[in-house]
Amino acid sequence: MSHSLPAPPASLVQQGQVSHGRYAGLIDRLDWSDLPARHGKGRIWQWLHHKRWQYVGLATEQVFIGLAIVDVGWCHTAFAYVFDRQTRRLLADWSADGLPRLSGEVQDEPVLRAHSTFRSWGASLAIRQIDEALQVQVQAGGIDLEASLLLTQAPPFLLAVGPIEGGLSHATQKSPGLPVTGQVSVAGKRFDLNGAMGCLDSSNGLLARDTAWRWACAHGPDVGFNLQDGYFGQHENVLWLDRELIPLGAAHFEFDARQPLQPWRVWTDDGLLDLRFHPEGARQQDRNLGFAASHYVQPVGTFAGQVKASPDAPPRVVTGLVGVTEDHRSRW
C-alpha cells in the first residue's frame, strides 16, 4: 500500500547529522554513538540523559495488559499490569527497580533482533524478536504471560526522529496493530489471548531532565493511531487506516488531570482525527525519590469518533476501539 512517508534511513546519524523526520518502515538500530563531539555533551551527560524503553500493550474484550522495560541510565525499572475490562479492576499491578546492566538490558535494536530483559527477585520480563514474531514473557507479581505478536504481513511501522529541547534527539518505532497468540494466567484466572490486538513502542533518546507528555494509542484490524503531545511535538502522530500509514498534525488532549477517569477528547489540528475516550479504569503511580520523581496515569478504555485519510476524504466512524491514554511527567 502506498503512503506519503519515506523509507527509513540506514542509521539515525549520517555524516554527523541526525536524520530528523517521520518514516514508514523498520530501522536496524536506534544508535546515537555516531553523534559528533561538537554537540558538546560529554559521556556523563549522555549517560544521565540517555533513556531507552520498550512498551507492549495487549487488548482483548476481556482484559488489557500493559508492560514495559525501561533503562534510564542510572537505573533500570519495569512494570506489568493486567486490567479486567469486565469487572473494571486491576487483577495485578507489579513494578520493580534494578541496577543498570545487572538487572537486565534494553538493546538498541527496536524491532528486528529486539532483546529487552528485566530480572529481580522472583520476577522476570522479556521482549524478544524470534523468527517472525515478538515473543513476550512475564513472570512477575502473580502474572504468568506468554504471548507472540506476529510481524508477518504487518502494515508499515512508524519511525520518528526529532530534536529535543533541553536534550539532544529522540527516536521511536511505533507498531501498527499486531495479531497476538498466547495466554495469561493471573489471580486464579486464565485468559486466552488468541485473536488479541497488540502494539509495540520502542523508544531511545537523549532527553531533558524534566520530561512530560500526553499519549494515546489504540489499534483494531483496520484502524489504529498513535498520538503524543509534549516533549516530542507531533513527530510520532500517525494514523493507520486500511493498512496505510498516514502522518497527522499536532495532537490536542482535553481532559481533567485531577479526574482522569472522566471522558477525554483527543484530536489533531489537521482535522483527520477527532475521538472521545471513555476510561474503564487506570494504572497509576506517583514516585518521589528527591533526585528523581514521576507522575504517571494510564487509563484503559475505548475510543469513538471519526478519522479521515485526508482532508477531503469521507470520515470513517470509529466505535469501541480499545486502547489507552496517558498523562506522564518525569524528572529523571
Report each predicted region and the residues it spans.
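Structured soluble/peripheral alpha/beta segments that form catalytic or ligand/cofactor-binding pockets
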Residues: 1-332
